[in-house]
Swiss-Prot record:
Gene responsible for this protein: accA
Annotated CoA carboxyltransferase C-terminal domain residues: 37-291
Function of the molecule: Component of the acetyl coenzyme A carboxylase (ACC) complex. First, biotin carboxylase catalyzes the carboxylation of biotin on its carrier protein (BCCP) and then the CO(2) group is transferred by the carboxyltransferase to acetyl-CoA to form malonyl-CoA.
Compartments in which it is found: Cytoplasm
Name of the featured protein: Acetyl-coenzyme A carboxylase carboxyl transferase subunit alpha
Catalytic activity: N(6)-carboxybiotinyl-L-lysyl-[protein] + acetyl-CoA = N(6)-biotinyl-L-lysyl-[protein] + malonyl-CoA
Enzyme Commission identifier(s): 2.1.3.15
InterPro entries membership: Acetyl_CoA_COase_a_su, ClpP/crotonase-like_dom_sf, COA_CT_C
PANTHER family: ACETYL-COENZYME A CARBOXYLASE CARBOXYL TRANSFERASE SUBUNIT ALPHA, ACETYL-COENZYME A CARBOXYLASE CARBOXYL TRANSFERASE SUBUNIT ALPHA, CHLOROPLASTIC
Family: Belongs to the AccA family.
Presence of keyword Oxidoreductase: no
Gene3D superfamilies: 2-enoyl-CoA Hydratase, Chain A, domain 1
Pathway where this protein functions: Lipid metabolism; malonyl-CoA biosynthesis; malonyl-CoA from acetyl-CoA: step 1/1
Subunit field text: Acetyl-CoA carboxylase is a heterohexamer composed of biotin carboxyl carrier protein (AccB), biotin carboxylase (AccC) and two subunits each of ACCase subunit alpha (AccA) and ACCase subunit beta (AccD).
Length: 324
């Protein structure tokens, strides 16, 4: 597993404890109580490190190569999966994976952005950057869910929509705008979970729904820290400062009313205990479906409309205090 800078001390401590345990099998160097003390110290070290992460360190956790992706969530929390492909206009976009799933016996249409896990799959998936046909594919599956009366789950994980010339020629901006319009009035419950990066229009084009959640170390922002740093300061070394200023993590966005729920991750991030994360996300999806399923469609759409209309309130600070 690739190590992040803040993880090195923890891993060294874990290796030392493992070595002591191995040597103890031959010679009793430490008693079991002494090893337990070392393990308690390790737990305290983890708590100290991971409770004081900077926003930029959390972005690094979010981008960890071993972080679970959409295909992992499908495998880890769904009993069944029937994949559907294509946008019925141009081609299939591998950056979007979707189809019929069953979660705890309930059928959903699940649609997720997929980055890939190695060089070959990342190239195939275009690093999770959707083309217009990806947004059309997502909308097609959403409309199919509406037709059959099934709730929709979106899993968001993208560095942004693909900015290439071919995507622009095929109407990238229009495809995103069309999704915003159509998803805002999709007549079925829509649940969104940001499982990794949620960057710019690439994320927003699949994130209009009735309940929006984020994993603890995921981020959701108008731009990446690198993009912000390059525009504001023309200096890529300002990534950390940009990450702090953007207020891109769950606790900030919940306060702003942009998301509804922050889903806890294991200490160190989702890649340290994927099974626990699958369980937490599954529990959230079922809980929200139970809350939304009995609402009349008119009420559901009205609440969704009001939810997104209320986004955009802000506060400025002057010498005399906060101003609305």
């Amino acid at each position: 597993m690739e190590l992040l800078p803040h993880e090195k001390q923890v891993v060294e401590y874990e290796k030392a404890i493992a070595e002591f345990k191995e040597k103890n099998k031959k010679n009793s160097l430490l008693s079991s109580s002494e090893i337990q003390k070392l393990e308690k110290r390790l737990d305290k070290l983890k708590e100290k490190i991971y409770s004081d992460l900077t926003p930029w360190e959390r972005v690094q956790i979010c981008r960890h190569p071993s972080r679970p992706r959409t295909v992992n969530y499908i495998e880890g929390m769904c009993e069944e999966f029937v994949e559907l492909c294509g946008d019925r206009t141009f081609r299939d976009d591998p950056a979007v994976v979707g189809g019929f799933v069953k979660i705890q016996g309930q059928r959903f249409v699940l649609i997720g952005q997929e980055k890939g896990c190695d060089t070959a799959s990342r190239l195939h998936r275009n690093f999770g950057m959707l083309c217009p046909e990806g947004f059309r594919k997502a909308l097609r599956l959403g409309k199919l869910a509406e037709k059959f009366g099934l709730p929709v789950v979106f899993l968001v994980d993208t560095p942004g929509a693909y900015p290439g010339l071919t995507a622009e020629e095929r109407g990238q901006g229009w495809a995103i705008a069309k999704n915003l319009f159509e998803l805002s009035r999709l007549a079925t419950p829509v649940i969104i979970v940001v499982i990794g990066e949620g960057c710019s229009g690439g994320a927003l084009g699949m994130a209009v729904g009735d309940s929006v959640a984020m994993l603890e170390h995921s981020y959701y922002s108008v731009i990446s820290p690198e993009g912000c740093a390059s525009i504001l300061w023309k200096d890529p070394k300002k990534n950390s400062e940009a990450a702090s200023m953007l207020k891109m993590h769950g606790e900030n966005l919940k306060q702003f009313g942009i998301i509804d729920t922050v889903i806890k991750e294991p200490i160190g991030g989702a890649h340290h205990d994927p099974a626990l994360v699958y369980s937490n996300v599954r529990e959230f999806i079922i809980q929200e479906w139970l809350r939304l399923k009995d609402l009349a469609i008119e009420e559901l759409l009205e609440k969704r409309y009001e939810k997104f209309r209320s986004i955009g309130l802000y506060e400025t600070t002057s010498e005399s205090g906060p101003e609305a």
